[in-house]
Amino acid sequence: MLLSQNVSAIGPLNLYPMVHISLVFGISYVAPVLSDEHCTLKMRFRNFQSVLSWELKNHSIVPTHYTLWYTIMSKREDMKVVKDCINVTRSFCDLTDVWVNTTDMYIPQVVGFRENAKLVICMGSFFLVPDKPLDPPEFEIVGFTNHISVNVKFQFDSPGILSEELQFYLAFIEEHAGNSVKRHQPQITGNITKNFNYVIDKLIPNTNYCISVYFEPKDPRKINRSPLKCTLFRPRRESESSESATIGGIITLFLITAVFISTVMILKRIGYICLRNDFPKVLNFYKLSVWVFAELPPLEKVATVEVIHVNRKKKVWNYNYDDENDIENEAAPHLISGGYTKHGLTGKLCPTSTTSPSLEDCSLEDCSEPSAEEPYLPEPKGDAETPMAPGPGLWQSEGTSGGYQTRGTLWQDPTSEEDSDSTEGSEGRIVFNVNLNSVCVRALEDDKDSEVTLMSPSCPEETVELEDLNETESSVLVASEEGTQLPFTNPSTECPRPQDAPSDKSDTSDPDVDMGDGYIVRQVNLKKFN
C-alpha cells in the first residue's frame, strides 16, 4: 500500500526518512475574480508555462471568440492586448512570455464576442509569486541491482522566470515502501535548465518502491504531487543467478576433471599410454596418423631354413659266409599280419635313376649303372619263370648264397639327394617289408658265369646281372634286427605297374630253394613305405 505525505515545513532540517519519493511543483490555484460574476479566471503552470484560463458561469451565453487584455497595477498603464490571444476560440491563453515579472500584480480582462457584439467581460488580478502553483515535472525511474536512479526532466519555455522563482521552491522526492515514507531533497539551484539524476541507494531487497516528484510551494496546501511510479527491487535474483552459475561452473569443471582422470587411468591400465620402452613395436603408437588412417601390415619376411640330415653310422656286423657265423648272426625274421616278414638289411644302395645326383658318390665297385652295364636278359621260361608280384614294388633285389651275391637298387626321393651325398665309406641302414608270397626263388647253376633274370612287378623290363663274388662281397645285404627308413624317389621316375601280370604263379611257386650248401636263395621284392 502506497502512502503519501504532505510537507508542511520548508527547509533542510525538516527532511525525514521516507520510503516513498514525491516531487511536487505545486497545486493549481484559482485566482479570485474581481470583475463580475459572469466568468471564473484561473492561473496555472503546466510544464513551467503560465497559462490563464476562464470559464463562463452562465452556460446560456456562448461567445464565438475571445480577446485577452491585461495591465500592471503598479505602473498605472492602459490595457494592453495580448497578440497571441486576439479573437481566439479557445478558453485559455499562454502568458509565459508576457507575464515575466514575478513581483508585480497583473490585471487581466477577457472579452467574449458573438460576431461583433460583446457578450461578456471578465476581469481579475494575479500576483505570480504566491499565486502561481507549479505542476510536477516528468521523471523516470530505473532499477539496478543495488540502487534506483530517478531522472527528472525540466521543460523550460521561459528560463528567466524559473531563475527567479525556483529559488523560492524546494524540490522533494518521496520514497514509499510499505508503510514507511522517506523524503529526499536534491540540491536544486535557481538556474536549473537541464535534466538531472538522483540516485536512491541502501534499499531493502525484494521490496516494491514507489517514487513521486514535486515542487513544494510556500503554501503547503498548494502542493501538487506527481503520480507514483513503482518498481520491484530484486538484487538477489541476479546474485542468485550468479551464484548458481558459479556453482554450475564448479560442478562442470569437477565432472570434466573426473572424466579426464578416469580416461587417462583406463588408457594407462589397458596399455595405450605410458608404454615402456622395451615393449614390442606393435604397441608403440608414436604416429597419430596410424590411429586415424590404418596402414596395411608389412609383408612377412621369408627366411631360408637349411635342414641338415645327419647320417649316423650304424654298427655293421662282420658278415662271412661260414655256416656257423651265418647261423649265429642271422637275424630272426619278424612276422607281421598279412603274411609279411620283416628283414633288416644293411648295405650300401645306389638308386637306379640316372638323373639322381647320388650316383656320383657311388663307386664302380659297389654299384653300377643299370642302363650302361646291365644287358637286357630275356625272360626265363618254364619252371624258372619268375612270377610278378601284385603289389606296387619299387625295389629290385637279388639273393645269393655261397658263391653268389645279391644286388639291390633303391629309388630315392630328390629331397634326400643332399643326404645321400656322402663318401664311399659311409653306410646307411634300411628296413624293408617283404611279402613272401610275392618272392620268386629259383635254383641257380653252379657256373659263376650264369645269369639270373629277376623281374620286378613295377618294372618288368629291368634285369639284374650276376657279378663276380669277389667284386660284390662288399655290397652284400646283411640281416639286422633294426633298420631305418630310406627316402623314396619322385613318383615321376617310377616305372608303371603292369596290370596284366599273372598273380597265380606266385602262389604255386616254391618260395625257398635249397642250394645244397645250407643256404636258401630268395628273390626279394621290396615295397615302398609311405
From Swiss-Prot:
It comes from the Eukaryota. This is Interferon alpha/beta receptor 2. The modification Phosphoserine is found at S474. It is a single-pass type I membrane protein. One of its GO terms (molecular function) is type I interferon receptor activity. Disulfide bonds join C39-C122, C85-C93, C210-C230. It comes from Bos taurus (Bovine). Keywords: Cell membrane, Disulfide bond, Glycoprotein, Membrane, Phosphoprotein, Receptor, Repeat, Signal, Transmembrane, Transmembrane helix.
